[in-house]
Amino acid sequence: MGMTITEKIIAAHAGRDYVEPGELVTVKVDLAIANDITAPLAIKQLEKYGIDKVHDPNKIALVMDHFFPPKDIMSAQQIKISRDFAKKMGIKNYFEGQDSGVMHTLLPEKGFVVPGDLVIGADSHTCTYGGIGAFSTGVGSTDIAYIWATGETWLRVPESMKFVFYNKPQKWVGGKDFVLTVIGKIGVDGALYKAMEYQGEAIRALDIDNRLTIANMAIEAGGKSGIIEPDEKTVDWVRKRTNREFKLYKSDPDAKYCCEYEFDASKIEPVVACPSLPSNVKPVSEVAGTHIDQVFIGSCTNGRLSDLRIAAAILKSKKVHPEVRCIVIPASDQIYKQALHEGIIEILADAGCLISTSTCGPCLGGHMGILAEGEVCLSTSNRNFVGRMGHPKSQVYLSSPAVAAASAVLGRIAHPDEVAKYEEVETLITL
């Protein structure tokens, strides 16, 4: 029996030739990561047991992104604890402020993750790195502390689900629409502890930004991980960012999947996830006209350069609706600088967008865009649970950057066709 890409990566890191779903294995970890919320908890565990050194400081990365810049005394203290720990342990991969960003955008951008890696993070959206062919998943702070101390962890080998997208997608449709369509189909618990593997010509046609978006939201279906087989696009993208050696893994033709789904990409419309679950997915056409108070374009899901390009292409020479605050947060300093260089920031600012330094910010209801009672936000982030972005009686819809930008102009949920001609902005859109 053959193995899936996920099983092959786990087997390699377990020192095994073969693994199968359900097995408990101990694996070596290539990178163990945490943020300003989860790192202090892990540090506390190490201190509790008198552990005064880490296994390998070069295989640890700490990124201050959730409440950065510090929004209050407590968040400032959390960051200080993390900073002091990094200095004490000789951890050079510590990111705060300058040349930093949102963790799951920053780390692959800087070449810290390559295809075939096994990455564990104290953050649920660690699954993002599957977009470049790594096995990555989230754990709690106690598990991260153990990895920091030993360099390894245990896993139960997950079953794999296969999602095949074929045919050419419609205009305006990209990775966010694909993954929301999947979650709408299987539900928020439809992939519990499963590896969600994406295949097909429509997936291969996507750029890396869109692939990372798809992998990012595996956890919204309960998935252990999301993964896309690396190809020439992946290799080119990674090679521009690191000289690290890596191995490309692919699923065997006779690999076993617990279930398989097929989607005709040509029939998928731009979609939104309605309150208050990522699985409450409907075509934009069914909810067009819904009033909004805020638009958020950013996060580890859709704050990359291609996302800002499409938002700027739609908003160029237009104005954000006067009753809407449109918050745009580039997901890394590098993305911000490139957007500045390309004139994207100027276009967004002229349109009336509020542009922030890189932070998770409003995505988790942390700061810089909190919702009041009764307010409605259309967000390009990944979660829309009750109270996710503010007051329990606020509401959050999820969409692609294209839908978000169009909606910001009209002050209501809108299809991009209502405000822009696809042919005029197509050169800025890479799907």
Swiss-Prot record:
BP GO terms, sorted: L-leucine biosynthetic process
Q: Which keywords accompany this UniProt record?
A: 4Fe-4S, Amino-acid biosynthesis, Branched-chain amino acid biosynthesis, Iron, Iron-sulfur, Leucine biosynthesis, Lyase, Metal-binding
Q: Where does [4Fe-4S] cluster bind?
A: C300, C360, C363
The record's listing under InterPro entries reads: Acnase/IPM_dHydase_lsu_aba_1/3 (IPR015931), Acoase/IPM_deHydtase_lsu_aba (IPR001030), Aconitase_4Fe-4S_BS (IPR018136), Aconitase_4Fe-4S_dom (IPR036008), HAcnase/IPMdehydase_lsu_prok (IPR011826), Homoacnase/IPMdehydase_lsu (IPR006251), IPM_dehydratase_rel_enz (IPR050067), IPMI_cat (IPR033941)
Is the keyword Amino-acid biosynthesis assigned to this protein? yes
Pathway the protein takes part in: Amino-acid biosynthesis; L-leucine biosynthesis; L-leucine from 3-methyl-2-oxobutanoate: step 2/4
Q: Does the keyword Amino-acid biosynthesis apply?
A: yes
Names of required cofactors = [4Fe-4S] cluster
Q: Which reaction does it catalyse?
A: (2R,3S)-3-isopropylmalate = (2S)-2-isopropylmalate
Co-factor note (free text): Binds 1 [4Fe-4S] cluster per subunit.
Q: Which EC number(s) are documented for this chain?
A: 4.2.1.33
Coiled coil regions, renumbered to chain: none
Q: What class of enzyme is it?
A: lyase
An annotated Gene Ontology molecular function:
metal ion binding
Q: Which Pfam families match?
A: Aconitase
Task: State its role.
Answer: Catalyzes the isomerization between 2-isopropylmalate and 3-isopropylmalate, via the formation of 2-isopropylmaleate.
Report the sequence similarity comment from the record: Belongs to the aconitase/IPM isomerase family. LeuC type 2 subfamily.
Assembly and partners? Heterodimer of LeuC and LeuD.
The molecule here is called 3-isopropylmalate dehydratase large subunit
Q: Which organism is it from?
A: Sulfurihydrogenibium sp. (strain YO3AOP1)
